[in-house]
A protein has these predicted regions:
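Carbohydrate-active catalytic/glycan-binding domains of CAZyme proteins
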Residues: 1-206
Length: 206
């Protein structure tokens, strides 16, 4: 884990766990994922891990460990436990890139929205999945629940989700960029997106 101790990240992802009743008591679960190709390892940047509860009561865990491929598309791996083992879902046969349709880019984050209304068209599958990603540009899109790495059929990615900044208060996106997900009248210079998207829901706010 510390073979690149002078760098931000190493060639594996390490997990820590704690009982929800005592978030001061953390346990090191050790390395849970690494990805060697041809005897070499890629660096694991800002990962995300989400739990999906299926309608039959089973749980699946989707790990978004880092970006691969010429277009910085995100690898997605699946496991039955949060500490692994994980199996990559969207890698090409040579392991060097991602398959067509892999939509998310640098430092991805995923949010799961559960559907409980029987009248909702997604009630049968039970959830919707949303992805967020980008480096010096914020993008987002609704994911296909069957793949968890491609866009949902009929949906397009939002190319500019929130404003990105080159330095505090200075927007780096092209002049005149529209942000369909930002409320009108907001100070666009206050968002300051750079990298490592991470979305959470607290109460009724995201």
């Amino acid at each position: 884990h510390d073979v690149r101790f002078k760098s931000y990240c190493g060639p594996d992802i390490r997990a820590w766990s704690a009982p929800v009743e005592d978030l001061s008591s953390w346990r090191d679960e050790g390395p849970i994922f690494t990805y060697p190709v041809g005897g070499q390892w890629d660096v694991m940047y800002a990962p995300d891990l989400v739990e999906v509860r299926r309608k039959d009561g089973s749980k699946e865990y989707y790990l978004y460990p880092h970006s691969r491929g010429r277009n910085r598309e995100a690898m997605v791996a699946k496991g039955s436990r949060p500490d692994g083992p994980f199996t990559p879902l969207n890698m090409t046969d040579d392991g060097m890139g991602t398959v067509p349709g892999s939509t998310m880019g640098f430092d991805p984050s995923v949010y799961i929205e559960y559907v409980t209304d029987p009248k909702d068209p997604d009630y049968g599958i039970g959830f919707r999945a949303y992805g967020f990603w980008g480096f010096q540009r914020s993008s987002a899109g609704q994911l296909d629940q069957n793949t968890m790495y491609s866009l949902r059929p009929g949906n397009q990615a939002i190319g500019y989700f929130i404003p990105a900044s080159s330095r505090y208060g200075v927007i780096r996106d092209p002049e005149g960029t529209e942000y369909p997900s930002v409320y009108p009248g907001q100070d666009l210079g206050s968002f300051n997106f750079f990298e490592a998207a991470s979305i959470r829901k607290v109460g009724n706010k995201f």
